[in-house]
Amino acid sequence: MTGEYKNTLDEKGRIMFPAKIRAELPDSNLVITRGVGNCLWIFTADKWKKFSDEIMKKTSLFKAQSLLVMRRLIAPAQEIEVDKNGRISIPQSLRECAGLEKDCIILGLGKCFELWDLKQYEKYLKESEPDFSEAAEALGEIGF
């Protein structure tokens, strides 16, 4: 599930989940959590289970880096549903974490979706251009 979908957050903190994505979902159950950077990650329930199980297997309560990941990704995760009108409700605490205002963009990354405030995403794109060039070059070096 890939693509970029611009949409608007309504006054109740809901956003329309794109019809193309909804058609590919196994059901209406999703999990939303903080992402890396100023975004939120949205997983299907089954992908979240695999992702979170893998994190839990490879982390320790006695390691600071593990605790950081668990506190930032696992703890804030919340189950949400696509409603009958195709919308998802973004919890207030997560809207604040990602700085979501009105105009947003949903990115399909294959493994999950990212939800960004549109202005923050555009800023990220500009700032990350040099890093993208380096990453693309590194992929070329390993045979892509």
Curated annotation (Swiss-Prot):
Belongs to the MraZ family. This is Transcriptional regulator MraZ. GO terms for molecular function: DNA-binding transcription factor activity; transcription cis-regulatory region binding. It comes from Treponema denticola (strain ATCC 35405 / DSM 14222 / CIP 103919 / JCM 8153 / KCTC 15104). Coiled coil: none annotated. Residues 4-47, 77-120 form the SpoVT-AbrB domain. NCBIfam families: division/cell wall cluster transcriptional repressor MraZ. The keyword Nucleotide-binding does not apply. It is found in: Cytoplasm, Nucleoid. Keywords: Cytoplasm, DNA-binding, Repeat, Transcription, Transcription regulation. PROSITE patterns: SPOVT_ABRB (PS51740). It comes from the Bacteria. One of its GO terms (cellular component) is cytoplasm. InterPro entries: MraZ, MraZ_C, MraZ_dom, MraZ_N, MraZ_sf, SpoVT-AbrB_dom, SpoVT-AbrB_sf. One of its GO terms (biological process) is negative regulation of DNA-templated transcription initiation. Forms oligomers. SUPFAM superfamilies: AbrB/MazE/MraZ-like. The lineage of its organism: Bacteria, Pseudomonadati, Spirochaetota, Spirochaetia, Spirochaetales.
